[in-house]
Amino acid sequence: MVKSITLVGSTGSIGTQTLDIVSQYPDQFRIVGLAAGSNVEMLAEQIRQFRPQIAAISAAEKLPALQAAIKDLDPQPILLGGEAGVIEVARYGDAETVVTGIVGCAGLLPTIAAIEAGKDIALANKETLIAGGPVVLPLVEKHGVKLLPADSEHSAIFQCLQGVPKGGLKKILLTASGGAFRDWDVERLAEVTVSDALKHPNWSMGRKITVDSATLMNKGLEVIEAHFLFGLDYQDIEIVIHPQSIIHSLIELQDTSVLAQLGWPDMRLPLLYALSWPERIYTDWERLNLVKAGNLTFREPDHQKYPCMQLAYAAGRAGGSMPAVLNAANEQVVALFLDEKIKFLDIPRCIELVCDRHQNDNCANPSLDDILAADQWARQEVLTATKNLASQPQIISVN
């Protein structure tokens, strides 16, 4: 039976890899809806290839260009523009599963719309749970939908948990490559350029998540996501540096057994599993050869080099609206870094300033409006914080 899929964030890294899977397995999957940010040319090509019933472009001013680019298609898909258009695509029609590939908190509202429409979620947008976990998880339960992780680490944990009885999980071990600077001395980080930060040693990803990998904020955010997905306390979720990125994460069980999921670093594998679960689909992809992979090594993360990791743990433990503030501040400050308006070491300093300013206003049981308000406040506060960085001491370590 062919599974019907809607994909939001279709022109990004997650989106294009998802469409690679759909094109490789047309007897398994079909596309109902597509939504993208601003890339008219790529979205038009995707519409021509996959013939969705509906499509949207978030940059509303580019809707006329999209309409013109596919004016010869027959039949014409429904074409929408703006954030409201993306939300409509997420809830539209008979799609069984919605893949959330939008980067950042922009994916929250489309994900909620899809859940409320009764659609299963292949979650590749970790910010949905990090910022919106207190709202999203009750909606998942209310509407009886499945929330399937589609990023490598949480997919690995999910796969390892198949067959583990309730209460059997003791600890989660999230593996991290260490990012672009895993072999750099801390002192060299003051010299980091944007080009340096975008040289990930193992994975092919978008610009924002590649910078997050370099700061290890990506792994810190994944700790918060794991807390929401699997229900463990933060003290039972650990990060370990694994430079080869062959073991994608591990779980420790109550009897001290440890289970791991292994594979080449290829995002298509967790995406395929999220789409095909509970089935396993044969692929002709390269098989893992442990002899070829060679040594698998592990080390503790350097807290001095990666202060963002500890900022994420602190925000997660604070709970409430604090993770939303952390996430929004990180998104905004990484964008400033990519635009070369701040230095690499300014990233954790700025995030810490913004989170500190939110402590007295942290909302313990936030509504969706509270989360969205905290998100917007944090983005504005980043602009103030960056102006004050010169007067703040540099972070050396966070205990």
Swiss-Prot record:
The keyword Chaperone does not apply. It comes from the Bacteria. Mn(2+) binds at residues 151, 153, 222. One of its GO terms (biological process) is isopentenyl diphosphate biosynthetic process, methylerythritol 4-phosphate pathway involved in terpenoid biosynthetic process. It catalyses: 2-C-methyl-D-erythritol 4-phosphate + NADP(+) = 1-deoxy-D-xylulose 5-phosphate + NADPH + H(+). Its cofactor is Mg(2+); Mn(2+). NADPH binds at residues 11-14, 37, 39, 125, 127, 206. Gene3D superfamilies: 1.10.1740.10, NAD(P)-binding Rossmann-like Domain. GO terms for molecular function: 1-deoxy-D-xylulose-5-phosphate reductoisomerase activity; manganese ion binding; NADPH binding. Pathway: Isoprenoid biosynthesis; isopentenyl diphosphate biosynthesis via DXP pathway; isopentenyl diphosphate from 1-deoxy-D-xylulose 5-phosphate: step 1/6. The keyword Manganese applies. 1-deoxy-D-xylulose 5-phosphate binds at residues 126, 152-153, 177, 200, 213, 218-219, 222. It is an enzyme of class 1 (oxidoreductase). InterPro entries: DXP_reductoisomerase, DXP_reductoisomerase_C, DXP_reductoisomerase_N, DXPR_C, DXPR_C_sf, NAD(P)-bd_dom_sf. Its EC number is 1.1.1.267. Keywords: Isoprene biosynthesis, Manganese, Metal-binding, NADP, Oxidoreductase. SUPFAM superfamilies: 1-deoxy-D-xylulose-5-phosphate reductoisomerase, C-terminal domain, Glyceraldehyde-3-phosphate dehydrogenase-like, C-terminal domain, NAD(P)-binding Rossmann-fold domains. Coiled coil: none annotated. Belongs to the DXR family. Catalyzes the NADPH-dependent rearrangement and reduction of 1-deoxy-D-xylulose-5-phosphate (DXP) to 2-C-methyl-D-erythritol 4-phosphate (MEP). This is 1-deoxy-D-xylulose 5-phosphate reductoisomerase.
